[in-house]
């Protein structure tokens, strides 16, 4: 899998923080997020899922993720936005790869990306969350085009 190393700016994000198996919580989170975006006429700059844990080290019921939209830096939450978080997604150096996801199988491209990145001795993972940006409406199109972001730092830092 090909990837690039990019410096990414901090993003302001709004949405829902979830805990539990990602294959259940992330789709449910996006249903909640879509309702909130539609009800409050939010104009998202991007749709993202943010992942905080390693599923090979953390039990499924404890996995943390956010389903969010990127919003302008001066965005404030509308009244009655119950359960919605507003926070910053840290910027920095990230490895970035594009993938096409079919049959709701988000795990396969992520695993391929991690495997490829671990082979690159120049970089190691940094202590920031991974995230994906959705480039199309997968529910409408039947597949998802995503950009995957893994935080990295130069080896030895």
UniProtKB/Swiss-Prot annotation:
Record's HAMAP family? Answer: DNA_gyrase_inhibitor
Q: What does this protein do?
A: Inhibits the supercoiling activity of DNA gyrase. Acts by inhibiting DNA gyrase at an early step, prior to (or at the step of) binding of DNA by the gyrase. It protects cells against toxins that target DNA gyrase, by inhibiting activity of these toxins and reducing the formation of lethal double-strand breaks in the cell.
Q: What's one Pfam family the UniProt record gives for this protein?
A: GyrI-like
| SMART domains documented for this protein | AraC_E_bind
State its location(s): Cytoplasm
State the source organism's domain of life.
Bacteria
Q: Which family does it belong to?
A: Belongs to the DNA gyrase inhibitor family.
**What is one GO cellular-component annotation here?**
cytoplasm
User: What GO annotations for molecular function exist for this entry?
Assistant: DNA topoisomerase type II (double strand cut, ATP-hydrolyzing) inhibitor activity
Record-linked InterPro entries:
AraC_E-bd, DNA_gyrase_inhibitor, DNA_gyrase_inhibitor_GyrI, GyrI-like, Reg_factor_effector_dom_sf
Keywords for this protein: Cytoplasm, Stress response
Which residues pair up as cystines? Answer: none
Q: What is the lineage of its organism?
A: Bacteria, Pseudomonadati, Pseudomonadota, Gammaproteobacteria, Enterobacterales
Q: How does it assemble?
A: Interacts with DNA gyrase.
- Tell me the protein's name: DNA gyrase inhibitor
